[in-house]
Every structure is written in C-alpha cells, then in structure tokens.
Swiss-Prot record:
Highest taxon listed in the record's lineage: Eukaryota
UniProt name for this protein: Basic helix-loop-helix ARNT-like protein 1
Chain positions covered by the region annotation Interaction with CIART: 508-588
Annotated crosslink Glycyl lysine isopeptide (Lys-Gly) (interchain with G-Cter in SUMO2 and SUMO3) location: K252
Domain bHLH: 72-125
Function summary: Transcriptional activator which forms a core component of the circadian clock. The circadian clock, an internal time-keeping system, regulates various physiological processes through the generation of approximately 24 hour circadian rhythms in gene expression, which are translated into rhythms in metabolism and behavior. It is derived from the Latin roots 'circa' (about) and 'diem' (day) and acts as an important regulator of a wide array of physiological functions including metabolism, sleep, body temperature, blood pressure, endocrine, immune, cardiovascular, and renal function.
C-alpha cells in the first residue's frame, strides 16, 4: 500500500511540475475533459432513452409512427408540388399554342418569355376588341370570292396586299386595270415604291412601318439572354398589328403617251414630257395584319431573317380620288362655303397648304409647296392679283380679291375668291408671310350677280392691256409652252419675286431718306416712288405697274424669235412687260441696280438655254462690252 501511494504521489508531482509541454497538455486536457463531459452527458441521455424504450415499448412505437407521418407528409407535399408544376407547365404550353408569336417559334421558349408575349398579344387585341368577330362580317350564304367582288364593286377600287418589311406587292385584284391600267401579273411581286411618286415614298413608308418589326423593341429571352424574334411588341395602338391605315398617295398610271410634234420648240422638252409617267391620286384605306410565313406559302429571300417572325402586311382598298367641286345649294339652305387656307412667302410661293385643298384643286400639298401662286392664275387675272399683292405687302389691312380663275390639276380652271393679310414680325418690322383664305365661288353666284362676289368681267384688265403694245405695232401673242395648259402665263413665277424686290427696294429707299424717320416703312403709299430719271429708279404706271422705257430695249428685239419664250434677255422682259423693271440704263458704265438685274437676266437665259428651255442667248443686253 505504501509503495502504491508513493507511485501515485510521484505521478501527481510529475503532472503538477512545470515543463515545456505543460501548457499544451493542460489545454488539451481541459478541452478533453469538456468533451468527455459532453460525451458522457449524451451517452447518458441515450442510455436513459434506451432504458426508457426498453421499459416503455409504446413510446418507441409512437416515435416510429411520428417519423412515418413526417415522411409521408413530405412525400405528399412533393407530389402536390409536382402536380402543380405539371399543371402550370401544361397551361403555359397551351397559352404558347394560342399566342401566334409563340406558336411560330422554331424552339421552345421559357415560361417568362411566353408570359411576356401573351401580355403583349392581349395589349394588341385590346384596341381591336369588338362584340363580333371577323367571321361574323360575312353572311353565311356568301362565299369569300363573292364577298370580295361585292366589296370591290361597292368601293369602286382595287384590293391590294403589301408586305410591310420591303413594300412588296403580294396580291392585287384584277380591278386595278380599270384604274391604273396595269394588269394583275404586272404588279404582283413588284415593289410598291417603284410605282409611287418620289415625294410620296416617305409618307407610304411611314404608314407601312410599325414597331412590330423594330429590332430595338424585341424581347429578351430570360434563359439565353438573346433577343427573341417576335412581331408584337409594346407601342402605340396605331402602330400595332391590326391598326387601321388611311392615306393618300400618287401612283403611276400606265396611260398610253400621246406623241406631240411641235417644230417650234426643242425636241428635248417633248421627249421629257412624253417619257414622263402620269400619276393619279389614290386613297388607300385598310389595316395591318400578321400571318405566320408558313401559312402564306411565299418564298422569302432571306429565310434566316424570316424564321420565327410573322409576316406583317397592309391589306387595303385603293380608290381613285377625284377632286370635289361643290354643287350649287338649292333654295334658302345655307351651306358652309368650301374653302382652304394657304400661306405664302412675300414673293407668292406656297409655304403651307391646307389639306382641304386636295379635295378642291386635286393637288396634294407637297405638289404646291415651293411653287409660285402666279403659275396657277389665269393670265387675265394677273394684273388685279398683282395689285392686291402689292397692297397686302404695303398695308396691314385685309385685302379681298375679286373672283379669279385658278388652274386645277386636270388643266381646267376653278373660280376662287381670296382674303389676304400679311403677318409682320414684331421685332424686325418686316413682313414674313401672307395668309390667304381661298373660297370657292359657285357658278350660280356668278350668274346671279351677287354684289358680294364681283363679276370676272368687272375685274381690272389684264396686264398686257394695261401697257402699250409697242411702237404702234400689233400686240405680242403669248407662245404656248409644252406641258403648260393654255390660260396661264409662261414664266409667271417670276412676277411675285419681282414685286417683292420692288417693294423691298421702296422700303430701303424710304428707310434711308431723312424725311422717313418719323413714318412707318409700310406707309409708303402717301409718297410717290422715285422717278425713272433717277439712277436705278422705276417708272410706275397706274395701279403701281412699272413701265419699260423705249430706250431700255434694243430695236427689233421684241419681234425676234417669237417661237422661243426665252431666246434672249429681252424676251424675258417681253413675256412679262407689266412687271418688268427698267433693267438697262442709258449709262452703261454705271453700276446701278438695274445693271445687276440685266446681268442676272442674261445669266438666267444662259441657264435656261443650257437646260433646253430656250434658244440662243443674245449678249447685246449686257451693260458692259464683252
């Protein structure tokens, strides 16, 4: 016993003595004790539970049943979730089959993309929702062909289908021959833009364009991150598939050209007129519709681009739009007068035309823009309208013209009556433009002698009758220019420009004189313009019409080359003697404004002769020797 005690004490002393490994052993011992405690506790609990199970077999059975119930509940939940996912997938597949854009896809789409396309399809159909479907339009006793013939007969036009991507004519009815004189085989497969007027191509492209085919609007696949090719994307309702379209455009008419031979004019002009295709105004009404390319049965040039995309087309009926001339109102029924509004520059050129002018004049607004109004006035009315032009530029009051004739598109004339007023810039105190309200005058009003509408015979004389015809010789006749119907004056577009320059020159002279400091530059009617004896002055006849002195023209120039309207610079003055300014001064060495105008007239003659619009140019009118 003593030896055993000694061994125990020595062991304890060795254990308690400090050493290099004491700290490590102590830390390990401490953690080991804790672990042993935990293990002992857990083993004790497990032992107690085992003892309890041995003692109570019912508790062990309940534990097993509890574990079984948990396992069964998990399996039932998994089955429920699986059935829910399967049902949701079946619904999404069914939804994808109902949406046209998803149905046309070559690959399977993810769920998010299908839902997006379905939402966009519902937005597209929202604007076209009606209590009746497309099939209900047609009665049951009518076939599709019979309905098509009835619609074409009632519309008095032709049916056409145009692809929105390239403007290709996919279908056109046989009735197009009655309007455009083209057969059905001539147009199918061709580009619509080849038969449109160049100024109307951009307008038609705007009508054909839709956000359906815009690449920047395509959806993104949630899985791959790549853009999804689709034909239905968010956008304004008027740009979605199924939106209605209504627009005017000019299309070529295959009319047989009439060969006109005139030896008095260059052959180049007649060739240009003969080769030029005539156009007619077509009113197209329809809507955009999409079909999958597999249902169209068409050969696409680029299958890679068309794969997975619907074919968006314009289905429309084209009708020949003829200008409307109002019928006389019978009895005491008062109807609103037919009128349109136009805006002109100070030289008379159109800068804005109301859309109502198309129904009255048969011109589209873009046809009139940039042209002078004097090109459409009858030559008998130019004198009165030129005087009104001067008055509206000099006063702030509204000027009402007499009834005058205006040339419409078919070459005939319509009677109009206009109210003009000028708009002055409040800062620059200069006239910016002229606003004209043009009213159609009915034939019965002219015949009845209504005092509010003066007779055409009561208008001032033409500009030729206001001026002397020459040195006692006969009055010069106006040559007929190819392509310009009779009744209008050749080169009349220069009249407005010369009137504007005349008024601006008077304003400049009055503005520079000391006596005009206290007066407005517009109130120039009280003081007469400068006399022709002054350098660069102009001699004005009654009504403000400038005269040409006899010394301003060379002898015999007024009778030379009567067949060529622009043979030389003097012929330009001879065509419009009523608005011509004294371009040639007696002193040819002075640098007056008239010399500059004479030089400009010679340059214009050179340009016209180079373009084939005139004959040889006579340089004798130049104010300086060559």
């Amino acid at each position: 016993m003593a030896d055993q005690r000694m061994d125990i004490s020595s062991t304890i002393s060795d254990f308690m003595s400090p050493g290099p490994t004491d700290l490590l052993s102590s830390s390990l011992g401490t953690s080991g004790v804790d672990c042993n405690r935990k293990r002992k506790g857990s083993s004790t609990d497990y032992q107690e539970s085992m003892d309890t199970d041995k003692d109570d077999p019912h508790g062990r059975l309940e534990y097993t049943e509890h574990q079984g119930r948990i396992k069964n509940a998990r399996e039932a939940h998994s089955q429920i979730e699986k059935r829910r996912r399967d049902k949701m997938n079946s619904f999404i597949d069914e939804l994808a089959s109902l949406v046209p854009t998803c149905n046309a896809m070559s690959r399977k789409l993810d769920k998010l993309t299908v839902l997006r396309m379905a939402v966009q399809h519902m937005k597209t159909l929202r604007g076209a929702t009606n209590p009746y479907t497309e099939a209900n339009y047609k009665p049951t006793f009518l076939s599709d062909d019979e309905l098509k013939h009835l619609i074409l007969r009632a519309a008095d036009g032709f049916l056409f289908v145009v692809g929105c991507d390239r403007g290709k004519i996919l279908f056109v009815s046989e009735s197009v021959f009655k309007i455009l004189n083209y057969s059905q085989n001539d147009l199918i497969g061709q580009s619509l833009f080849d038969y449109l007027h160049p100024k109307d191509i951009a307008k038609v492209k705007e009508q054909l364009s839709s956000s359906d085919t815009a690449p920047r609007e395509r959806l993104i696949d949630a899985k791959t991150g790549l853009p999804v090719k689709t034909d239905i994307t968010p956008g304004p309702s008027r740009l979605c598939s199924g939106a209605r379209r209504s627009f005017f455009c000019r299309m070529k008419c295959n009319r047989p050209s009439v060969k006109v031979e005139d030896k008095d004019f260059p052959s180049t002009c007649s060739k240009k007129k003969a080769d030029r295709k005539s156009f007619c105004t077509i009113h197209s009404t329809g809507y955009l519709k999409s079909w999958p390319p597999t249902k169209m049965g068409l050969d696409e040039d680029n299958e890679a681009d068309s794969e997975g995309c619907n074919l968006s087309c314009l289905v429309a009926i084209g009708r020949l739009h003829s200008h409307v001339v109002p019928q006389p109102a019978g009895g005491d029924i008062k109807v609103k007068s037919t009128e349109y509004v136009s805006r002109h520059a100070i030289d008379g050129k159109f800068v804005f035309v109301d859309q109502r002018a198309t129904a009255i004049l048969a011109y589209l607004p873009q046809e009139l823009l940039g042209t002078s109004c004097y090109e459409y006035f009858h030559q008998d009315d130019i004198g009165h309208l030129a005087e009104c032009h001067r008055q509206v530029l000099q006063t702030r009051e509204k000027i009402t013209t007499n009834c005058y004739k205006f040339k419409i598109k078919d070459g005939s004339f319509i009677t109009l009556r206009s109210r003009w007023f000028s708009f002055m810039n409040p800062w620059t105190k200069e006239v910016e433009y002229i606003v004209s309200t043009n009213t159609v005058v009915l034939a019965n009003v002219l015949e009845g002698g209504d005092p509010t509408f003066p007779q055409l015979t009561a208008s001032p004389h033409s500009m030729d009758s206001m001026l002397p015809s020459g040195e006692g010789g006969p009055k010069k006749t106006h040559p007929t220019v190819p392509g310009i119907p009779g009744g209008t004056r050749a080169g009349a577009g220069k009249i407005g420009r010369m009137i504007a320059e005349e008024i601006m020159e008077i304003h400049r002279i009055r503005g520079s004189s000391p006596s005009s400091c206290g007066s407005s530059p517009l109130n120039i009617t009280s003081t007469p313009p400068p006399d022709a004896s002054s350098p660069g002055g102009k001699k004005i006849l009654n009504g403000g019409t400038p005269d040409i002195p006899s010394s301003g023209l060379l002898p015999g120039q007024a009778q030379e080359n009567p067949g060529y309207p622009y043979s030389d610079s003097s012929s330009i003055l001879g065509e419009n003697p009523h608005i011509s300014i004294d371009m040639i001064d007696n002193d040819q060495g002075s640098s007056s404004p008239s010399n500059d105008e004479a030089a400009m007239a010679v340059i214009m003659s050179l340009l016209e002769a180079d373009a084939g619009l005139g004959g040889p140019v006579d340089f004798s009118d130049l104010p300086w020797p060559l």
